[in-house]
Swiss-Prot record:
PANTHER family: THIOPURINE S-METHYLTRANSFERASE (PTHR10259:SF11). It is found in: Cytoplasm. It comes from Shewanella sp. (strain MR-7). The keyword Cytoplasm applies. It comes from the Bacteria. This is Thiopurine S-methyltransferase. Keywords: Cytoplasm, Methyltransferase, S-adenosyl-L-methionine, Transferase. Gene3D superfamilies: Vaccinia Virus protein VP39. S-adenosyl-L-methionine binds at W10, L45, E66, R123.
């Protein structure tokens, strides 16, 4: 996916991937990670996700990375969070006391920024990449995460031929095959969410499963 694709989506506000509510899997399973309240938590390709507010409410220091500037600005504006902005290398750094968002390319994000994170949360990042680029992203995520860090991965799976992504279909087999070198993987839950996604229903996609995994960086 070229950067221009995502910039155009945000500019036109064609952001069906943005959830209006906190992800139920996050609420149900986050405590499974048993992270201390003051843990630093990394959220890749964070957009303006309300899930970051949930993480901050747990006491965590949230570190996000997002390509699009408008998404970052809208996060702070819509949640009425006064923020400061500064340049940090190739990225723009928007931050409050608890939330630090780095606007720019995740593939050039310095490892020093995530060196002290102990948790991570990926709901919309892995599924944003077509299969041809997904492995590259997964390796970059692994490089950014310290050994021993734990997180939740949320995926969607459906017959890919039924609909062109994003979001792209990520099967349990793909997760096991491509992530097991860098992560210990535990499948926590999987449920059919087709009825909650009108776009998939309209395109007559026969099934749509949302799954959540606990990942631990080796």
């Amino acid at each position: 996916m070229e950067p221009g694709f995502w910039h155009e989506k945000w500019q036109q506000q064609l952001i069906g991937f943005h959830q209006q509510d906190i992800n139920p899997f996050l609420v149900k399973y986050w405590q499974t990670l048993a992270l201390p309240a003051d843990a630093k938590v990394f959220v890749p390709l964070c957009g303006k996700s309300l899930d970051m507010c949930f993480l901050a409410e747990q006491g965590h220091q949230v570190i996000g990375c997002e390509l699009n500037e408008l998404a970052v600005q809208q996060f702070f504006e819509e949640n009425q969070l006064p923020m400061k902005k500064s340049a940090e290398g190739e990225h723009q750094h928007y931050h409050t006391e608890q939330v630090s968002l780095y606007q720019g390319d995740i593939f050039t994000l310095p490892q020093s920024i995530t060196a002290k994170v102990s948790g991570f949360y990926d709901r919309a990042a892995l599924i944003a990449w077509p299969e041809s680029m997904r492995t590259q992203y997964a390796k970059q995520l692994a490089q950014l995460l310290p050994s021993g860090s734990v997180g939740l991965l949320v995926t969607l799976d459906y017959p890919q031929e039924a609909l062109s992504g994003p979001p792209f279909a990520v099967s349990p087999t793909w997760v096991e095959t491509h992530l097991s070198d860098d992560f210990e993987i535990q499948a926590l839950a999987c449920q059919d969410v087709l009825a909650d996604n009108p776009r998939f229903v309209k395109k007559e996609v026969p099934w749509l499963n949302e799954a959540v995994y606990l990942l631990r960086r080796k």
